[in-house]
Structure formats: structure tokens, C-alpha cells
């Protein structure tokens, strides 16, 4: 078997290095915690009582402590946004925070299962041990109970079963097919983690093996979480004015807002709340305005329950174009909108590269709107100076031709002001055209494309990523290219695969980044 060369390792490291290190450290930490505890109890008097059952139960309990201490960290969005601005951003994959949060949750799930199964076995063995043997081996007085009483009549027993019920509620509501249509239910059940942590604190109060220590593991992360919530609460109290709501084709609402002291970077996102719809329901949306503009905007795709209600609230007459202006309060007197943020995202990293590939699928184009606007303003302010990015390849994939109208004005301006040809636009239409539209395209002779209104012609069908990446790999040999994507998972897999493949097989290094919030 051939070992990989130094160059192959370096190329693998481009997209996998920091993730691999984090997973290795996390795995080693879990193994060390389990093995240390297992060996400790193997050499303790308790092993004489119930054997390997106590070793396995306590090892799983140690995994629970470690992972419960970690699970809040990936959702501390303000902390992660701050850390993005430090040297740690070069080593820690902050964009994978939700993936890591889910990984920790699964480890907690399996550790809980192992802990419960081991103790069910231990309960069976406890009944065969007399109080005298407890006294002789462990030096304590302990009653002889039936397995049922151990499981349900002791503090550790009944709290453990309630913890399992809470976990079932939290885990099932987090399944995507349930979370998306019933987000508020997910929000409330996920906050049962407070009950979960509280029960685990008291779970070990009557332990005969060691003093309870769960609280020592979680007090730090819980303190950070409280600070996080206080920051978000204070920010959400700031007055937000809806200065304009505009209805675009293909069920997209553009909301432009003004609020106090809201500084952000291109590519970041915010959380939006409409108290009239749901007091505690916050949804993430990419910021589509640029920092140079005197408002903050989001483009919202009307696809779910909450966005549907927002559409009805802002556009009761089902009109197109501008439907609301300068609104502070909803008809019920509550604030029309509340903002929390901004928060860091993958697209923030775009200015680290001199050559970038931006891929937006449908409404996934939103983070790149902010970036392209920012570049436009920078070019206008610093004409003929060194640009922020040497070359931008912008791929916009839409199923519906009307979707191109969302940012047609911006794209048109960029095409006209395309200094040094820094921007290449590649619009793709994947949906079918009507017979009339086909005739217009075939026989039209306008200077602008009849589908998009851009000067760049529309391509039909899906992009051929292998050909595209092969071309870029030749064009940017020995260079680093940032690849940024926002859109569906299936397309993300294709782009990630292409980025990894052409990084390994050519001299170009494609750094893949995906929006994930």
C-alpha cells in the first residue's frame, strides 16, 4: 500500500485539514474520558459488586458530562462571530458549528443509551447483594430493593427516566421534516435542555459511588449561554423600522429595515422576528444590502408557515411591487419586526481570495448580492486602484426565469461598470420555457438577453461542473481559488466533490465554503 506524498497531504488539507483535526481531537477526548473512567471503576470496590456493568455505566456517564459541556458552544453565535475575527479562524471550522452540534447530540444519545442499559443490568444484580455486603465492600448502608424500585423509586432512577422522555421530545422535534413546518414547537422543545441539565444535576445527588459533579462541567458553558441570551435580548429590544417591503416574482419578499447601531460585513446574516406571528420565533436570513447602504435588507423566500404568515401580514392585498413603507408597528400594536445580529457566515471569507467562484441556486444568491454590492461601492470609491478581488465568476442557477428579476438592477449595474472585466456572470435556467418564450429567444435580436435582461446570455440546463472546474484549474494553476455556495444539499455535494477532486489532481487549490446557519 503506497503512502500519500507530502504534496498529496497538503492538497487534502486544503478542504479537510481543520475539520479532520477537530474530529480527531474530539474523538480522542471522548475515548480518553471513557477509558479513564472505565479503568478507574475496574480498580474500585464497586467492581466487586456489579462487575463490568458499573465500569460501562460510569464511562458513559463521563461521556455525558463531557458532551453536555460542549453542546452549547456551537450555538453561541456571538462568541463564534467574535472568534472568526481572531487567528483561530485559520484552524477551527466555525462554519460547521451546526454539524458539530448535531454530532455532539448523537454522542449524548448513544452515551445515554449505554448508561441506561448498563444500569438496568446493574439493578438486576443489586437485588442479590445483601446490606451486609454493601457495608463490607463499599463501607455504606444501602437498602436491598427490587429492580423496579431501583429504576423508579430512587432519585437517580426516576430522574433518569424523565431525562429520557425529555430527550425523546427534543430529538424528534429536531428532525427536519418536523422542525421546518412546526418551527415554534421545535424552538420550545429544544429549550427543554434547561430541564435536561437540571435533572442531570440532581440525578447524581444520592450517588453511592462518588459526589455529583455534572454541575461542574456545565456551569461554564451555561454562564456563556446566559450572556449570549442577554446580548440577543438587548439587541432585539432596539427599535426597527420597516422602511420598505417589496414583493418580487417567484414568491420572494424584500424587506428593507433601519435599526440602531447595526454594523455588519458583506456575507453575514441576521435573525428576524415578527412578534405578531410568533413572539419567540426567530429565523435566519442572509443580509442582501451592503454596509455602504443606509438600510439593512433581506430577501425572504415564502416557502413555510412563518414566511407565509409574514407575506399575508405585509401584503394582504396580494399585490406586486412596494406594499409597505415606513412601518413601526403591526395592526395589533406590536413591533412590525425585530432584528438580532449580525452573525458571521462562510461568505465573509470571500475577500481572503483574489479569485473566487460564487454559486447561488435560486434564493441562495442572497449572500452574494451583499458581496457584489460591496465590491461595486468599493470600485466607485477607489476607481483604478487595486480591486478587492481580481476575478469573480458568478454562477446563478434558477428554475424560474422571473427569479432573475430579484437582483437584475444590481447585475445590470455591475455589467456596465465591469472595470478590468473583474466579473464574469453565468446565468443558468433549469426550468422549461413556454412556446412563446422559446420563439422570443430564437428570433430575438436585442442586445440584452431576453430571459434575464443581462448582457450575458443565459445557458439552459444544469452547469457541467467537471468542465467548469477543469477550465478554472488550468486558468488558475498554482493559485488559491475560493468557492462559495448557498443552496440545496445535493448541489453542495457536487461542488464539494469537484473542489476536492480538482484540488487533488491539478495544481490549483479550490477552497470550498458553504453557507450553513
Curated annotation (Swiss-Prot):
Effect of loss of the gene: No visible phenotype on vegetative growth, but prevents formation of fruiting bodies.
Catalytic class of the enzyme: oxidoreductase
**Keyword annotations:** Electron transport, FAD, Flavoprotein, Heme, Iron, Membrane, Metal-binding, NADP, Oxidoreductase, Transmembrane, Transmembrane helix, Transport
Q: Which residues form the Ferric oxidoreductase domain?
A: 58-201
CDD domains of this UniProt entry? NOX_Duox_like_FAD_NADP (cd06186)
The record ties this protein, via InterPro entries, to: FAD-bd_8 (IPR013112), FAD-bd_FR_type (IPR017927), Fe3_Rdtase_TM_dom (IPR013130), Fe_red_NAD-bd_6 (IPR013121), FNR_nucleotide-bd (IPR039261), RBOH/FRE (IPR050369), Riboflavin_synthase-like_b-brl (IPR017938)
Identify the residue ranges that face the Extracellular compartment according to the record. Answer: 41-62, 119-149, 206
Q: What is its EC number?
A: 1.-.-.-
Cofactor(s), names only, from the UniProt record: FAD
Q: Which GO terms describe its cellular component?
A: NADPH oxidase complex; plasma membrane
GO biological process terms held by the UniProt record: defense response; defense response to bacterium; defense response to Gram-negative bacterium; killing of cells of another organism; sorocarp development; sporulation resulting in formation of a cellular spore; superoxide anion generation
Identify its membrane topology class: Multi-pass membrane protein
Record-annotated residues binding heme? Answer: 101, 115, 190, 203
Instruction: Relate the protein's function as given in its record.
Output: Critical component of the membrane-bound oxidase that generates superoxide. It is the terminal component of a respiratory chain that transfers single electrons from cytoplasmic NADPH across the plasma membrane to molecular oxygen on the exterior.
Q: How does it assemble?
A: Composed of a heavy chain and a light chain.
| Protein name stated in the entry | Superoxide-generating NADPH oxidase heavy chain subunit A
Q: Which organism is it from?
A: Dictyostelium discoideum
